[in-house]
Regions:
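Carbohydrate-active catalytic/glycan-binding domains of CAZyme proteins
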Residues: 1-278
Length: 278
């Protein structure tokens, strides 16, 4: 067997939203000691025969993280700095507390705790407690490629409304759009935030009880989160995560009760049909 790098692009655009991935192929040695594909071709296979070697179980990355442990899971990523610099699972039992830092466009210190997107059919959910006091305080759920390309469903303090609100910020190759026409005033109590990714289409929903969700904002093009579309990317692949910003004092915190990442193409296609999105 041989392990190799690959990508699974959207076609016909050839946009690799999942970035660089790892695959395995069954090989054979020829009589003159060359390594060849087992079937004699030179094309990578989507499905490969299993090896007869003994199994070596590897711990699976959990779909659901309730943050009950003493340490943050090693499957999380953060731009440029270690997650422990701003994410604390000991401050409040059963939660991760994110300390807000600079704007998400910053190339210095930002508070984004993320996981790699491993399928373009996924559902990401979190439960957040956050009470913004000024406009520069915000926290929420993010679909992130780099500091110039992301979609952020955020709770923040709206000076126009005079209270907390939910709205979506979209950066596309550095061009910022805030969808104020879909802004929603919300109460300062626990709130569920959810992101659906269904192939080329991605959208956000929110709920107070975790049962009855409301869609917010428009549907976004998943394929644009790729090196082939983004001008500033480094082929890291798209990330999904939670985030907090305090552009004043870098002290304001948001508490997240859990982070759930479910990637299942069959289930998500059914959900898409049930909700009537076409």
């Amino acid at each position: 067997y041989l392990v190799h790098l690959c990508s699974r692009p959207f076609v016909p655009e050839l946009r690799c939203t999942l970035g660089r991935e790892t695959a395995i192929q069954k090989m054979m040695w020829t009589e003159d000691n060359w390594l060849r594909m087992a079937d004699g071709s030179n094309l990578a296979k989507m499905e490969v025969p299993e090896s007869s070697l003994p199994e070596y179980p590897v711990e699976k990355t959990p779909d659901f993280d309730d943050f009950d442990g003493e340490e943050l899971g090693n499957f999380y990523y953060a731009p440029r700095i270690m997650p422990e610099r701003f994410a604390d699972v000991k401050a409040r039992k059963g939660y991760v507390r994110l300390r807000g830092q600079e704007s998400r466009t910053s190339l210095n210190k930002v508070s984004i705790l993320a996981r790699k997107l491993t399928s373009v059919y996924a559902r990401i959910t979190t439960k957040m407690e956050f009470v913004p006091e000024v406009h520069q305080h915000s926290a929420g759920l993010i679909l992130y490629y780099d500091n110039m390309n992301y979609i952020n469903l955020r709770k923040y303090y709206s000076e126009t409304l005079g209270q907390s609100a939910l709205s979506i910020i979209h950066l596309e190759n550095g061009e910022k759009t805030e969808f104020l026409n879909t802004r929603i005033p919300v109460e300062d109590k626990p709130i569920y935030l959810r992101l659906y990714i269904e192939g080329r289409k991605s959208w956000f929903e929110w709920s107070y009880d975790g049962e009855n969700y409301q869609k917010i904002g428009r549907i976004f093009d998943t394929t644009r989160f790729s090196d082939e579309y983004c001008k500033y990317g480094e082929f890291t692949g798209t990330m999904v995560g939670i985030t907090c910003a305090d552009r004043v004092l870098h002290k304001k915190c948001a508490d997240f009760d859990f982070f759930e990442y479910k990637a299942d193409e069959i289930i998500l296609k059914e959900i898409w049909t049930e909700n009537g999105y076409d």
